[in-house]
Amino acid sequence: MPSNALWLRADQLSSVSPAVLDWLFDEGSLTRRLTALADGAFRVEPLLEGWQTLRDDECQGLDVPTGSSGWVREVYLHGHDRPWVFARSVAARSALEGSGFDLALLGTRSLGELLFSDSAFERGPIEVCRYPAAGLPAEVRAEGLWGRRSRFSRGALGVLVAEVYLPRLWDQAGIADV
């Protein structure tokens, strides 16, 4: 992602509606929340998976050296067959190797479901930003979309999960003041 992403904690925000804050800082499973909102009509659409050089802000979020290699997984989280969330999850190669955790095997399964079902994973603080449009797939690219990220840790393994809330989600949730 371009370096103009400014990740903020809840106490650093102002003028954000309570309804938006509720979605951004909900510490439960986003997969479960989306599934409920979609009355079960939820699915994961993988867009990209593979080894890449991690972005600078991702290296910082994972506490690994700038330019580190890692596994990158980008997906849409769909409700009613429409993309509601763009998610990008990354883990450093150095931490993944030998961890017994293989992101390549997820396919159309939700990473969030896996992370929340394994009590060994601990979730770090949630940070939010107005996600840079350049970091989004072309078909949903827009300025000013809210994104959030948090690190899930299990021993030496860290998985950084970023989720960008797309306009159709806010429409479905009945939230206008985004």
Curated annotation (Swiss-Prot):
Record-listed E.C. numbers: 4.1.3.40
Key word Aminoacyl-tRNA synthetase present: no
SUPFAM superfamilies: Chorismate lyase-like (SSF64288)
Xref: InterPro entries: Chorismate--pyruvate_lyase, Chorismate_lyase_/UTRA_dom_sf
Major place of residence: cytoplasm
Location of this chain's protein in the cell: Cytoplasm
Annotated pathway: Cofactor biosynthesis; ubiquinone biosynthesis
Keyword annotations from UniProtKB, A to Z: Cytoplasm, Lyase, Pyruvate, Ubiquinone biosynthesis
Broad class of enzyme this protein falls into: lyase
A GO biological process held by the record: ubiquinone biosynthetic process
Pfam family, one: Chor_lyase
Residue numbers binding substrate: R73, L111, E163
Reaction(s) this enzyme catalyzes, per UniProt: chorismate = 4-hydroxybenzoate + pyruvate
Gene Ontology terms, MF aspect: chorismate lyase activity
One GO cellular component, as annotated: cytosol
Function comment: Removes the pyruvyl group from chorismate, with concomitant aromatization of the ring, to provide 4-hydroxybenzoate (4HB) for the ubiquinone pathway.
Family from the record: Belongs to the UbiC family.
Protein name: Probable chorismate pyruvate-lyase
